[in-house]
Amino acid sequence: MPIFIDRRLNPKDRSLGNRQRFLRRAREELKRSIRDRVRSGRISDADGEQAVSIPTRSTDEPRFEAAKDSGRREHVLPGNKHFVPGDRLRKPGHGAAGTPDPSMKDSEDDFRFVLSREEVLDLFFEDLELPDMVKLSLKEILAFRPRRAGFAATGSPTNINVGRTMRNSYGRRIALKRPKREEVDAIRQEIAELESGSQSPVARQRIAALQAEVERLERKRRLIAYVDPVDIRFNRFEAQPIPNAKAVMFCLMDVSGSMGEREKDLAKRFFVLLHLFLKCRYDRTEIVFISHTHEAQEVNEETFFYSTQSGGTVVSTALEKMHRIIAERYPGSEWNIYAAQASDGDNAAADSHRCITLLDEEIMRLCQYYAYVEIIDERERHIFGTTENGTSLWRAYSSVNANWPNFQMTRIADAADIYPVFRQLFTRQATAEKLRVRR
């Protein structure tokens, strides 16, 4: 019985345009639902499965059907006592008899299903990426690595695939009916038994026939080789290009005494979102965590997010630590360097000038992109409504922002600001537009 598999992209006579429009609409509903859940809950909730609900009307495909309250139509109805063939019936008006009560109308629940962690993160970070303003000194050279690509009939002896070769040999020997060694040995054993017995004419005739059969089988075994060159298979490899560009992201967080629990919580939420983003979109990106008070230190992921360390505030120590790590492990000629810094902006004026010097003279010329996020109080949102107003560190960084197109700065006042700010910082188009305008 034949089996037909429908591989059409537009099955069931549905319009291809409508189908694509439906998929786009459902995708937007999914993205909106996930973002709303993350805004109202914890950022780390995005790193797992999500039960998502979207309105049922968003899952329906458009279709043509006859309007129920207009047009002319004919029906075949059962007989009755009031009407005869040819009578015309008035259309019932809105709200007239025959209109169903609203409470009797059918309704459907929202369409609800579970997305996997990978699907959630793909939707969550779909149109975000690290800005890729490639350095002029960084040449685009591809490295190659071998990748298995099946089998070949020719190749180096070191790449011979014994399993595939023997399988081909076995199949060929079966197809050509090559005699087995056991068959020849059995005939020779029978000849030996006959020769050791009485040499009757019948026995001698049988021995001659068996010897002829042995010669025939041996000749066929010689003609049909056990392993023929046609059987040999080699492992085939293709050179797969891989980008030689390597990226590292520096995460700098202020954990000094001026950063209260609320400020630290918002900063950690921002960095958790950044961490999920990097893990989801860039497998080969390294992450360096630096926390600072009056002194800076490189820490691991767990310490960075869950440490309760506190102390004074000297922001320049974090920049100096970052510069030392770059010099030791991440040369600018080989690595694409990114940085994200979160602070409440509380810093001594003298140290803020030191930060300007470090950024202008050392760090910004090495970085592809630098994002600064300042955590402010909700009551300060209107006070610091313009970029001219702000803390000592904000005013200092404003001069860096004016000189370097790959520097971005913004503010966060509450948890609802984190995701919009994150999208603002890591949308490529925004940074590219800033670079174009300043040129």
Curated annotation (Swiss-Prot):
InterPro entries for the chain: UPF0229, vWFA_dom_sf
Bias-annotated ranges (Basic and acidic residues): 58-76
Region (Disordered): 39-106
Source organism, top-level taxon: Bacteria
NCBIfam families in UniProt: PRK05325.1-2 (NF003707), PRK05325.1-3 (NF003708)
Family assignment from sequence similarity: Belongs to the UPF0229 family.
Protein name according to UniProt: UPF0229 protein Nham_0975
